[in-house]
């Protein structure tokens, strides 16, 4: 199959630094190639260039991985689907203009949607009026070979909060937790709130640091007030770490597993409760590292693509909902 993937166009693919969507696109493209498919990555902000590149490649399927470009959907003459990675897609009242700029376009165009979670698909069904036959669950995957793995972590007594430090991730709420360490670039929205002089702030990790050092921590913490299907959780699992997330970060995780902990939103300001939950999860995670590494295989990109993306692409190509 010949597949075109459209990226945001603002950061190179693969990215040199941070860029979750760009990493996802790159790793997905490499897995597709390993499965025998031809892949074109289009990464430009010029809509005319996008359409021209698609037509030149003449793909069997087009996957728009940046929801702002849903407006191009009617102009793409090939079977197509759109994915949103917007962190507040399930909380449109917090959208900051997203609803009018992007979501209402979905309601008008009613494209095929590759949604990252069941909750996201429900939003498109109930609020955008997109028919169920146009909605497909397609979780993100991860490249399992990227991360170093150890059964004896150097910092097993520490938890790592690995994310851009901003208002959505809320890191400043948890800085008094002594065993919680933070890595990520600081967004202006957190300046004055997040104490970057703290010994627990590790600065912004390079890709090499991320791939080499993540496995040396006991577990991952991600307590955002909005997420879609966060890549960092799968990266943590692939490095052998359990995860502590909010209700917004639990998409596609097996909540029956002891090393996956969900903090209820109504308890997010109870720092003592959060700290105890993080420590308890860390202790369980250290005892279950082999099991975590085995579970992470469920998110291997080749497995995810074969189970979800390729069958749904074929259904759309066959005319079920073009």
Regions found by a protein language model. Name each.
Residues 95-113:
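Membrane-proximal helix-turn-helix segments that form the acceptor-binding/catalytic region
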Residues 242-246, 252:
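Short hydrophobic beta-strand element within catalytic cores of glycosyltransferases
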Residues 92-94, 125, 139-157:
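Acidic anion/phosphate-binding donor-loop and adjacent secondary structure
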Residues 168, 265, 269-273, 282-318:
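A charged, aromatic-enriched C-terminal amphipathic alpha-helix characteristic of glycosyltransferases
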Residues 108-134, 142:
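A short, active-site helix/loop in glycosyltransferases that binds the activated sugar's phosphate group
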Residues 114, 151-181:
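Conserved donor-binding/catalytic core segment of Leloir-type glycosyltransferases
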Residues 225:
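Aromatic "clamp/platform" in nucleotide-sugar-dependent glycosyltransferases that forms part
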């Amino acid at each position: 199959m010949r597949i075109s993937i459209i990226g945001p166009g603002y950061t190179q693919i693969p990215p040199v630094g941070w860029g979750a969507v760009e990493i996802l696109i790159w790793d997905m493209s490499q897995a597709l190639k390993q499965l025998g498919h031809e892949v074109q990555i289009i990464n430009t902000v010029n809509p005319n260039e996008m359409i021209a590149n698609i037509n030149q490649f003449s793909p069997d399927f087009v996957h728009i991985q940046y929801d702002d470009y849903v407006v191009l959907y009617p102009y793409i003459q090939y079977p197509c689907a759109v994915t949103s990675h917007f962190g507040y897609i399930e909380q449109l009242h917090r959208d900051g203009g997203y609803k009018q700029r992007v979501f209402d376009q979905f309601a008008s165009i009613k494209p095929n949607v590759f949604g990252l979670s069941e909750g996201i698909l429900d939003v498109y069904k109930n609020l955008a009026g997109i028919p169920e036959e146009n909605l497909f669950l397609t979780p993100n995957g991860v490249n399992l070979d990227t991360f170093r793995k150890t059964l004896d972590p150097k910092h097993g007594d520490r938890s790592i909060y690995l994310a851009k430090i901003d208002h959505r991730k809320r890191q400043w709420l948890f800085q008094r937790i002594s065993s919680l360490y933070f890595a990520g670039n600081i967004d202006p929205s957190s300046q004055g709130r997040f104490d970057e002089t703290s010994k627990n702030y590790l600065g912004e990790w390079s890709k090499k640091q991320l791939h080499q050092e993540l496995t040396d921590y006991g577990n991952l913490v991600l307590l955002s007030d909005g997420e879609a299907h966060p890549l960092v959780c799968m990266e943590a699992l692939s490095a052998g770490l359990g995860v502590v997330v909010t209700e917004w970060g639990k998409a596609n995780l097996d909540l029956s597993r002891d090393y996956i902990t969900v903090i209820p939103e109504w308890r997010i300001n109870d720092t003592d409760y959060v700290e105890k939950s993080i420590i308890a999860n860390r202790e369980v995670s250290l005892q279950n590292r082999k099991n975590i590494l085995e579970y992470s295989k469920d998110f291997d990109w080749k497995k995810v693509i074969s189970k979800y993306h390729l069958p749904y692409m074929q259904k759309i190509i066959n005319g079920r909902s073009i």
